[in-house]
Structures are given as structure tokens and as C-alpha cells.
Design a protein with these regions (language model features):
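Glycoside hydrolase catalytic-domain context in secreted enzymes
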Residues: 1-530
Length: 530
């Protein structure tokens, strides 16, 4: 075990893990042990692991200051371990770039310390990690810091898909590391086997939890209606029913804990929250353009098929066969669902649209999980054809704080890619001026949703990792074998003219040299011809 982490076992109950350096002490009640997370010497309901996640979340939400709730609503920008020296994901260590800082790969950056301790941020998005061991040690340092702050709320770390071999975009930036390798979602769909997808979910969840990751920013269940879209490979294809079946299996695999790992209702130490995306369907961008760019902000639904795009959500992610029942989080896409708002007639990005979130998602389809914006929607856009910058589609005329307020009033709980609490606090003041004390209740509503996803997976009891277990779990041979077998199963023979296949032995095969023209990567940086 890590020398700075103490484990306390409860007979027939939860095992506690805490760092003495955090100041947390152990309380006892009827022979059972509990963590005194707020250090007040009393066992409060949110500290009592015998109670339901819902009751604990409601108790804790009432105790939080508005500043602490605002911190829960933040979801960090992309973090790599260690931080990159330059570029979009850069960070510093005591003011220096990593190569010249003398820091360890698992040390916290200056920026991480600030957003955890000053902005009360508790949801962190990870990309590349130097090694599974470095990720585990980094997680333990993050959790020890969070445990010693305020009410002791642990960090809920997350990732975009990282089990593929290609890392070329912001939304797969963690792929290609020391982890089992599987087909992408489109390859999984080509197997037509939901059981295979559920097996992937179970294995991926085990690897994620060993890395300190408790939320997956996946599955991507957009219907691939335009082959020109550059994100088709991340979907389960063009068939809504197949996508629904795969979405259901994916979420069941990720979220379901079994046996000794289960805490309650299928949730537990083997669970990873699934954030299904992108509501209400992001695969119908005008002319195949993508809404990461200003030139691709519009989603069009020819033929009156808007509701068809809901099927992977309403018949899949919201109707799981497992005990967790539904995906615990959802991400609306950047797009403006053009002329689909039949109530308010607004053409604004989905996270800003009260009809899309409050009326459709919340009321009609009764979804009460976390809704988190896609990354950086509240910032200002700089260039139409550049990935970098905000994506305030349809609300460019509003201030940053007004955008936050509009998102909250639309029914969304969390802001992807936002590290600073100040705009949320400004939005809260706007709500107090317009609605009075109701605004506090609105903030608590989101806090409860966010906290439930942290309680359910056992992070309040033990957020710490055994580094040796991490090294022995992530990318272990049986997981690698399962991924390889899935790759074989995903292959589809499209054509075999003149019976070229199978190849006869002794044949010479010509493989032409690949040329790549000059261009720009997803961040807008130039790529030379090669």
C-alpha cells in the first residue's frame, strides 16, 4: 500500500481509505468506522456509508456554500500527466515547465492546485499519462489534497475514449497508451454483438478505476447520417436500433459492479459513470461539418427525422438491463438543432436551449442524471475554421457570465472545459436578482446530481489506489487478448473480387508509399507535407 494512505476495514461494510496528512480522523458508531470528512467530530449523514447515495448527496448539498457548488459544476480543461511544456494542454510546476522543473511526473501542476483548492473544482479530465503507475500516484496526491479541503469532497476523474490506437483529436487525446487495445465504436458495431460491447465495458471500467478514473465521457451514440462527418468512426453507425443496443450494453458494462465490488443497486468500486453523448444527436451537421468549428454549428434533420436521433438514448442509454438502470450523465452537443425548438423558437446551442434540455430531456424523457456541456461552449470564438476557442453557438452576443446563466436556466448542471468558478458565481447573482431564493434551490439541484455520481462509485469512502494493483491491472495480458479477439471479430470483408483472398503464400504484395499533403491539425497548427 502507499505509505501515506491508511486503510480501515469494516466487518460487513465499506473499507475506508484516508491520508492522515489531510487531517481526517476516524469516527466510530456501533462498532463501525466512518471518515470525519468535515472534521467536526460528529458523524453527519453524508459521512455515513450505511445511507443511500441520494440521501447523502442531499445532506451534503445543503451544507455547501455557493462557491463550493460552483466548483462542483466545473469540469476541467484537458490534463496530461505530466503536463505538457507547451501548447493547448500545457502546465507548470512552481512556475517552470516540466523538463526543467525537477518535478516528478505524478506531481500536481500549479494550475491543478489552484483549480482544486481555490475554485473548488472536483471533476478532472485526463488525457495522456506517462504510465499507469504515474496516473495512480497522481490520483492519490489529488485525493489527499481534496480530502483536506472544506467538506472533503473527492475528485471524480474522467477520460475520453482511450482504448484505441489513434490520438489525433481533442476527444481521443488519451488513446494509444499502456492499456488494452480494442476496436473503435464503429468496429464494435460491425461485430453486431452487444455482449462483446458489454465485455469491453467491464474490462475498460476495471482499467479506468485502476487509473483513478470514475467517469467515462462516452459512449458516443450519434446516428451517423452523413458520411462526410469526421466523427463517424466514434459512433455505432447509422442504424438507430443497433446503436441503441450497443449503447445499452456499453453503459451496462461500464456502470455495473458485481460481487464484493458492489455497494448498492449495481453501483460500486468497479463502476464507472457513463456520460452518453451527444444529446439530442450530433451526427447530422450541415454538409457533414463538425460543430467544434464555427463553420459547423448547425445540425439539420432532413426528412423530419429529428426524433430518430433520440433512439440510442431513449431506447438504449436510458433503459439499461442492469441494476444501474440508466446512464448517469449526458452531454449535449455544440450544435444548434436548427428550427427544432417548437416552444421558444430559439436557434442556440443545445446546452443553451431550454426546450432541448428542460422540455425534451428532463420532462418528456424523465432524465434526472447529470447534464454536462461539451467543452468550452461559454468562451468567445476566435476563428470560424479553428478548433481553439469557445463554441458559444447562437449566443455570441451574450457575456461569458450571461452564457453560464442561460445554461443553468436551460437545465444543465456542469460546464465542460471551465476551470474558473467566477462566471458561475456571477450567473448565480443574476439568478438571485431575477428569482430570489429559488436560485439557491436550482444550484442545489445540480449539486445533488453531481454528488450522487461520486457517492455511488465509493470515492467518499476510499478514493485511493494501490499502485501495484494498478500496474498489474491496466493492460494485463488477458485484457489485451480480449481486445485483440474483438478486433478480429470486428473485421468485415466488403469485397473479394476474383477471389484474391485468402492470399497464397509466396506472393509479393506492393504497398505504395503514403504521402500526406500539408495542412493543419485540429488545433490549427501547420502540418508539413510528408
Amino acid at each position: 500500500q502507499n505509505p501515506d494512505v491508511v486503510l480501515v476495514k469494516n466487518a460487513g461494510g465499506q473499507t475506508l481509505g484516508y491520508s492522515p496528512a489531510s487531517g481526517v480522523k476516524i469516527l466510530t458508531d456501533n462498532g463501525l468506522s466512518f471518515k470525519d470528512l468535515n472534521k467536526n467530530g460528529a458523524l453527519d449523514p453524508y459521512e455515513d456509508w450505511r445511507l443511500s447515495a441520494d440521501l447523502r448527496a442531499r445532506d451534503l448539498a445543503e451544507r455547501l456554500s455557493i462557491e463550493q457548488i460552483a466548483g462542483l459544476m466545473l469540469y476541467s480543461r484537458h490534463q496530461s500527466i505530466p503536463a505538457r511544456a507547451d501548447g493547448y494542454f500545457a502546465g507548470t510546476y512552481k512556475g517552470k515547465k516540466f523538463p526543467e522543473s525537477g518535478a516528478k511526473p505524478d506531481d500536481l501542476t500549479d494550475q491543478q492546485i489552484v483549480f482544486l483548492s481555490q475554485d473548488n473544482l472536483r471533476h478532472v479530465l485526463l488525457t495522456t499519462v506517462q504510465s499507469p503507475e504515474a496516473a495512480a500516484r497522481w490520483n492519490n496526491k489529488v485525493q489527499a489534497l481534496c480530502e483536506g479541503l472544506g467538506l472533503g469532497i473527492p475528485a471524480n476523474n474522467s477520460t475520453d475514449p482511450r482504448h484505441g490506437t489513434v490520438s489525433t483529436m481533442e476527444y481521443n487525446a488519451g488513446a494509444g497508451g499502456q492499456i488494452s487495445m480494442w476496436p473503435g465504436s464503429l468496429g464494435m458495431a460491425a461485430s453486431f454483438d452487444p455482449n462483446l460491447v458489454e465485455q469491453f465495458g467491464q474490462i475498460a471500467a476495471a482499467e479506468y478505476r485502476a487509473l483513478g478514473i470514475a467517469t467515462a465521457l462516452s459512449p458516443q451514440v450519434d446516428i451517423a447520417t452523413d458520411p462526410r462527418w469526421n466523427r463517424v468512426s466514434g459512433t455505432f453507425g447509422e442504424n438507430p436500433k443497433l446503436s441503441a443496443a450497443m449503447s445499452q450494453a456499453y453503459c451496462d458494462g461500464f456502470q455495473t459492479s458485481k460481487g464484493s465490488q458492489e455497494i448498492k443497486n449495481g453501483w460500486g468500486y468497479g463502476s464507472v459513470n457513463a456520460m452518453v453523448k451527444h444529446w439530442p444527436g450530433g451526427g447530422s451537421g450541415e454538409a457533414g461539418r463538425d460543430a467544434h468549428y464555427g463553420m459547423g454549428k448547425f445540425a439539420v434533420y432532413p426528412g423530419g427525422k429529428f426524433a430518430t436521433h433520440f433512439i440510442p438514448f431513449t431506447k438504449g442509454a436510458f433503459k439499461l438491463t442492469g441494476k444501474t438502470k440508466m446512464a448517469s450523465a449526458i452531454m449535449p452537443y455544440y450544435t444548434i438543432s436548427w428550427n427544432q425548438d417548437t416552444k421558444n423558437k430559439e436557434n442556440v446551442g443545445n446546452s443553451y436551449n431550454s426546450y432541448i434540455i428542460n422540455d425534451l430531456l428532463r420532462k418528456k424523457y424523465k432524465y434526472d442524471g447529470v447534464a454536462c456541456t461539451d467543452w468550452s461552449i461559454t468562451g468567445n470564438k476566435t476563428q470560424m475554421d479553428n478548433f481553439v476557442g469557445g463554441k458559444p453557438h447562437g449566443v455570441e452576443h451574450l457575456s461569458v457570465a450571461q452564457r453560464h446563466y442561460k445554461v443553468l436556466m436551460a437545465g444543465v448542471d456542469q460546464f465542460g472545459g471551465n476551470n474558473e468558478a467566477a462566471p458561475i458565481l456571477e450567473a448565480y447573482k443574476m439568478g438571485m436578482a431575477e428569482h430570489g431564493e429559488w436560485m439557491r434551490a436550482r444550484m442545489e439541484q445540480s449539486a445533488v446530481r453531481l454528488l450522487k455520481n461520486i457517492f455511488r462509485v465509493g470515492l467518499f469512502e476510499n478514493p485511493y489506489l494501490d499502485v501495484e494493483n494498478t500496474k498489474n491491472t491496466v493492460g494485463k495480458p488477458e485484457f489485451m487478448t480480449a481486445g485483440y479477439e474483438a478486433q478480429l471479430k470486428s473485421m468485415v470483408l466488403l469485397k473479394n473480387k476474383n477471389k484474391v483472398l485468402p492470399l497464397k503464400t509466396g506472393k509479393t504484395v506492393y504497398v505504395p508509399k503514403k504521402y500526406t499533403p500539408a495542412g493543419r491539425n485540429f488545433l490549427g497548427a501547420p502540418i508539413p507535407e510528408k
